[in-house]
């Protein structure tokens, strides 16, 4: 995801024109100022951002459907006229006949809107309340620590996204849970009554030599979902595989078609634990949105590995973020909520470290000041410079508090973490520095106030 964000910001800074193709809605929303839509062989240009495109496209399709309905009604009326009796045919208007032929040709060439996949899950019996327990789990391979002293409890109904760069250990984490590999140290306990459906990013569950139909039904004509028998060809049409395409070998399919096929096969399995490892690769936006709806309503436990930020945000209720050197932290919410919490966490850590550093300074200076106050009461009076400083400190404190409020508001904005890392890091550092500066200024104000009170005989 860091690479995606870097590319976004690199392209946003680019001064020339950019043409890009993407199914990543976050990328499109952030970058596109004009969208060219390819629909049924026709290109249509939409000015504006992605959300405006969706609204305009929906309205265009509504108008098109209405126009087609009126056209078909008129065509049916003309067909009735041309089939009238002998008398009507003798007196028919040749121009009207030619117009009817043109209408029939126009109707023949019309390309209907491509359907969307119709997905449904074969639900299973409920698992036990505890699905997985991990206690101080670590995992190392080839001298590299992927996981260090991690503990968690995954409960029935949890929807967790594993987020991190390639190679950080997301798939390894899943293999640890499933018992395919053993941890270097720590304990992992599995719950009861688990029925697992696993979407593998490598599509290992598909036989490339078999045709689409046989991959799903294993040579049978019927499949069963939720206790109801279906013909396999009818089921595959819901995943946008017409009968002819259902007879095609898997090795001839596109990446998107293979992912749809894997979903078709996966969703047939009764399950209460669904593991999706990069399910969004090559899926079109309509199928993505339908999958999101299904996962939102899913009653079982869900584990997701994905680089699609919008997909995670729409499906996950908790995120596990891989932060390097074996660190894995848990954050409540979708992707953007998790990233904001992560930034706030590390910003507060930075403030704590700075505060500790100040407290650990040698105490000699503080002791000398105290001795000076007790042994030299005559010199306790504020100097002119200190008096000026004391007068200016309230204004400085107010300015620092205003700056902190402004920075906190910027960081709380969900769009904040869509900026380049150097920008977000600079803002987070500025917040930590300003909070430290405020603390220092406040301590100085207290010190000067105390000195002034001593001079005035109030202490």
Curated annotation (Swiss-Prot):
The name under which this protein is listed is ATP-binding protein Uup-like
Checking CDD domains in the record gives: ABCF_EF-3
In terms of superkingdom, the source organism counts as Bacteria
Q: What is its main location?
A: cytoplasm
Protein species of origin:
Haemophilus influenzae (strain ATCC 51907 / DSM 11121 / KW20 / Rd)
Localization of this protein:
Cytoplasm
Q: Could you say which residues bind ATP here?
A: 164-171
Spell out the reaction equation it catalyses: ATP + H2O = ADP + phosphate + H(+)
